[in-house]
Amino acid sequence: MEVNILGLIATTLFILIPTSFLLILYVKTASQEE
């Protein structure tokens, strides 16, 4: 089986970017409530 490196990188970025964005938003709102 041949692994498509570009596809793997694209999928990783596609998952990591929104996740980190939501995580930053959550941390900001959580720190504001305290």
Swiss-Prot record:
GO terms for cellular component: chloroplast thylakoid membrane; photosystem II. Coiled coil: none annotated. SUPFAM superfamilies: Photosystem II reaction center protein M, PsbM (SSF161033). The keyword Metal-binding does not apply. InterPro entries: PSII_PsbM, PSII_PsbM_sf. It is found in: Plastid, Chloroplast thylakoid membrane. It comes from the Eukaryota. It is a single-pass membrane protein. The chain crosses the membrane at residues 5-25. Keywords: Chloroplast, Membrane, Photosynthesis, Photosystem II, Plastid, Reaction center, Thylakoid, Transmembrane, Transmembrane helix. GO terms for biological process: photosynthesis, light reaction. One of the components of the core complex of photosystem II (PSII). PSII is a light-driven water:plastoquinone oxidoreductase that uses light energy to abstract electrons from H(2)O, generating O(2) and a proton gradient subsequently used for ATP formation. It consists of a core antenna complex that captures photons, and an electron transfer chain that converts photonic excitation into a charge separation. This subunit is found at the monomer-monomer interface. NCBIfam families: PS_II_psbM (TIGR03038). PSII is composed of 1 copy each of membrane proteins PsbA, PsbB, PsbC, PsbD, PsbE, PsbF, PsbH, PsbI, PsbJ, PsbK, PsbL, PsbM, PsbT, PsbX, PsbY, PsbZ, Psb30/Ycf12, at least 3 peripheral proteins of the oxygen-evolving complex and a large number of cofactors. It forms dimeric complexes. Belongs to the PsbM family. HAMAP family: PSII_PsbM (MF_00438). This is Photosystem II reaction center protein M. It comes from Pleurastrum terricola (Filamentous green alga).
